[in-house]
Amino acid sequence: MQRLRSSNTGHRRDTSRLEGLFNCRSSFPRMQPRHSFSAFTSTIASNVLHGTALTFGLALTLQAAAQTGMPALRVVSELKDIRMKAVAALPKAGGDAGDRDSCPQLVIKPKSPAAKQVAAQGWAVMADVPLGAFRAVSFAGQMQAATSGTCNVTQGNVAVFQNDKLVALAYGKSAEDPAIGALTPLEGGAVRVWDGDISPLPVGDLRVDSDGTLRLSKVADEDAVCQGRALVPNVYNMSIDKARKALADKGWKPVKGGASPEPRQAALVKRGIGEANSCAGTGLAYCDFNYVGPAGKLTLTTVGEDDLPHVAGYDVRCR
């Protein structure tokens, strides 16, 4: 699936139906509202000088941490585009606050001591979640508002704290890459890491191994939901025809949607995908598809205008 980018402001619409999805058990990160726009272009600019300064600052921090006898902690990143190091100090955010104030819908008020430490260095905090005996805080140095409430996040990082002390930092291979955005907790104690694109996708899972190693690895093949009573396969970025088959293999049955004059929904129904429930005619072209299983209801959301659109995320309402 080609990643979506746009600079067209488009027309805003009522998104109360889609916004409601974020109030249940969700695979989506805390993210921008789903507003509409009519075209996609690749015009999100990067601040190269700002990014270079940030990367240099991180390099100095890593070097200093290695020389000051920080606690021994094994950290492993299995992802080629995200690095992770044991560190003991966090650099200040580069640039000025104006680089981070254009996407308030992505920024949270820091509440934990760990998140407050990050905010005190000038970073925009996006997520603050438990990670076993640790705490993971994602934050960014630059946020670029895109169309209809969407946002492109760069200079994203994940700080890992233990007893309110910084012990590790995950960061992208370059400051201009939207490699890291928000975080969502998973059943079992792991944390899902999302990218910072305007239509976010998960990039990996952060977990604590039995020996205490912090490991950032690829997205799991399946997620346990509803206290382990059901499984959801990894259908991210999968076309809807393949995703519905993968869901069926895990016991999720399609729920027939209602009649709709929306052309894309009608076309999906003609293809035999009768669970298409609603489609946005403009913007990121979200469509929802409903399923039911022994543990509850699942709503799959796709993005894009392909005849068979690709999965952006899912939401589960447990019984």
What is each stretch, according to the model?
Residues 2-11:
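Extreme N-terminal basic, low-complexity initiation segments
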Residues 67-319:
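Exposed acidic/polar residues on beta-strands and adjacent loops within beta-sheet cores, strongest
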